[in-house]
């Protein structure tokens, strides 16, 4: 079957248009990716699911807590497949666990963020994605 140039162009444009929602879904444009904010609190709920895992955490006011971080936050992680490669699993956290998370907050100021990593009690970092910086040897 021989396609003429205009028909091929239309098919290609339709294909790109259909792919646009997938690119939009995987965009980090809503997050302030240039900001790393530390959140210290307790896990309310840990959701190990696809397409994104979530840690719902509550940050209470305290002497070593940034007042801007007080509240209940939804930390969005990666897929279970990618997070699993970084050392996460379905029982990594449970409600009540103390957690220190470093994340990129939502630009609109609402209580959500893109998880960068969590700091484990032994000082190691557990990254949510393939976002581990070059040279970081933490496990």
Model-predicted segments: where are they?
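Bacterial N-terminal signal peptides that target proteins for export
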Residues: 1-12
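Short boundary/loop segments of OB/S1/cold-shock single-stranded nucleic-acid-binding domains
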Residues: 23-37
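Conserved hydrophobic positions within beta-strands
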Residues: 41-43, 98
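Short aromatic-glycine-enriched beta-strand elements
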Residues: 49-62
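Short, structured beta-strand/loop micro-motifs enriched in basic residues and often containing a Trp
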Residues: 76-85
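Short nucleic-acid-contacting surface segments enriched for D/E, G, S/T with interspersed K/R
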Residues: 85-100
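OB-fold/S1-family single-stranded nucleic acid-binding modules
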Residues: 106-130
């Amino acid at each position: 079957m021989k396609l003429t140039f205009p028909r091929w162009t239309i098919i290609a444009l339709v294909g790109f248009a259909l792919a646009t929602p997938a690119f939009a879904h995987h965009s980090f444009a809503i997050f302030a990716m240039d900001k790393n904010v530390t959140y210290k609190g307790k896990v309310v709920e840990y959701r190990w699911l696809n397409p994104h895992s979530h840690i719902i955490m509550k940050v209470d006011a305290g002497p070593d807590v940034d007042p801007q971080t007080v509240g209940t936050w939804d930390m969005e992680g990666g897929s279970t497949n990618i997070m699993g490669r970084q050392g996460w699993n379905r029982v990594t956290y449970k409600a009540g666990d103390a957690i220190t998370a470093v994340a990129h907050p939502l630009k609109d100021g609402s209580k959500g963020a893109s998880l960068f990593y969590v700091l484990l009690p032994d000082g190691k970092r557990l990254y949510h994605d393939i976002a581990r910086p070059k040279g970081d040897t933490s496990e």
